[in-house]
Design a protein with these regions (language model features):
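Well-ordered alpha-helical segments embedded in enzymatic catalytic cores
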Residues: 32, 70, 88-89, 218
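Fe-S-dependent hydro-lyases/dehydratases of central metabolism
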Residues: 95, 107-110, 115-247
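Amphipathic alpha-helical packing elements
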Residues: 3-39
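Generic amphipathic, hydrophobic interface segment in small proteins and small subunits
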Residues: 34-51
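N-terminal glycine-rich anion-binding loops that anchor highly charged ligand groups
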Residues: 2, 41-44, 182-187
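Amphipathic alpha-helical scaffolding segments comprising HEAT/armadillo-like alpha-solenoid repeats
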Residues: 27-35, 58-77, 98-110, 129-141
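Short amphipathic alpha-helical segments that mediate assembly, nucleic-acid/protein binding
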Residues: 4-7, 30, 45, 67-68, ...
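Structural detector for internal amphipathic alpha-helices that build alpha-solenoid repeat scaffolds
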Residues: 19-23, 46-62, 76, 83-98, ...
Length: 247
């Protein structure tokens, strides 16, 4: 059985638990999905497009690497998908939260096609997930006289990735849910015993409040009752023990 058909079976299994499809994090699975997108008459083409665009785990996963590489091919015209034009490809790269997407954006910004380089630079100026290897590439290009690299560095120096964000609303309506009272830690919301599921946020959510489904449903119901407000969890405690980045 192909990885794709195994994934479809997993989707059916998750439906029984009230879960949406798990985000794709495996490059081998995404490669099959991309191959199906490239085949105009493939029966799973539409589903594959949706998985590719909306359901690939971003960051440094192997699937993110495969997605970024394919988006680069689309931008350079080395591959073609009618539903993903150049603007759409850049938009998807902008939401991929670092890792291989930044590498691709730098390749394009420092490349030979000026129009593409300018578009890539505009996206890079909005990104915050750059690491030393990425900034080293920009520094080297700047020192070599690359004008676009210099422009990107100036943008970062002026913090345009922050100053160009939309203004915070004058008024923010919130509704609070007291998550716990007394001696608690982040284990209440993200139990260490369920650490294996943290990459699958929807599944991991079922462990909130120590697997207390009554309280989980109370929180979801609160959200339904106040669709125009933001739900804030409030731990009524002077300090909260934090042993990791879970908070």
């Amino acid at each position: 059985m192909s990885k794709y058909h195994t994934y479809l079976q997993e989707i059916e299994d998750r439906k029984a638990e009230g879960l949406h499809p798990k985000p794709v994090d495996d490059a081998a699975l995404l490669t099959e999905i991309i191959d199906q997108i490239k085949a105009p008459n493939h029966p799973e083409r539409e589903a594959s497009l949706n998985f590719f665009i909306y359901n690939v785990l971003p960051g440094t996963t192997s699937a993110a690497g495969a997605k970024a590489a394919f988006l680069k091919d689309l931008i350079l015209g080395e591959a073609e998908v009618a539903e993903i034009d150049r603007a759409s490809a850049f938009e998807q790269l902008s939401h991929m939260k670092g890792g291989p997407s930044i590498e691709v954006l730098l390749d394009l910004a420092l490349g030979q096609d000026e129009a593409i380089a300018l578009e890539a630079a505009a996206v890079l100026k909005t990104q915050v997930f750059l690491y030393e290897a990425d900034t080293d590439r920009l520094a080297a290009a700047h020192e070599a006289g690359h004008a676009i690299a210099t422009d990107i560095i100036k943008s970062y120096a002026q913090a345009e990735f922050f100053t160009n964000l939309p203004d915070v609303e004058e008024t923010i309506d919130v509704v609070t849910y007291v998550a716990g009272v007394g001696d608690i830690s982040t284990d209440l919301l993200s139990p260490g015993s369920d650490a294996h599921s943290r990459s699958d946020r929807e599944l991991h959510g079922k462990s909130m409040f120590e697997h207390d489904t009554v309280r989980q449903n109370e929180l979801l119901e609160l959200q339904k009752q106040h669709p125009d407000k933001r739900v804030m969890l409030v731990a009524e405690k002077g300090t909260m023990g934090v042993g990791s980045s879970r908070i």
